């Protein structure tokens, strides 16, 4: 097989990998939007239509999550790369940060306007005082992120701050719908599996989770540090 054929197959694989990653992330974001909107449930069974998920809000949430994960990827490359690639990723990350803040602001305003229960959760007293740190931290982390991306000596903080922004975003989701797991009517406890099933799963989790953690820490240790030019899989 000649090198041109190998390069062609490599390009096809890259496009498929990119497309599949974007589609999976977009679908996950649409799922988040559908959870915020709530589901039609009658007698503990879904009673909505087959295309209830296809709304402008859900599509918007899907696009927002694509931007969030793209920022995770670009700041990861800031941390792992150097020279020209790192500088390019810093510029890309600044653009993605602005886009992410636009999506966060739009969804944060859109959600309470469309869902009175969520508006009451966030904007009534004394809840407002207790929940105000969430948007305040988003602003603080974003300002720190911008400064770090402009600082050529900052390598790890942009990625860590992006993790913080995404954590705050999902924390806001949890605050908005708690204690419901299937809004607007089924709570976490109502949707829970029987106690015996949970106990069985707990035993398996206690055995598997330590193995996963050890493997994850070891893989990060092996691939620690910067990736030099020419290194990687071919």
Model segments located where?
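Hydrophobic alpha-helical transmembrane segments
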Residues: 54-68, 132-135, 199-212
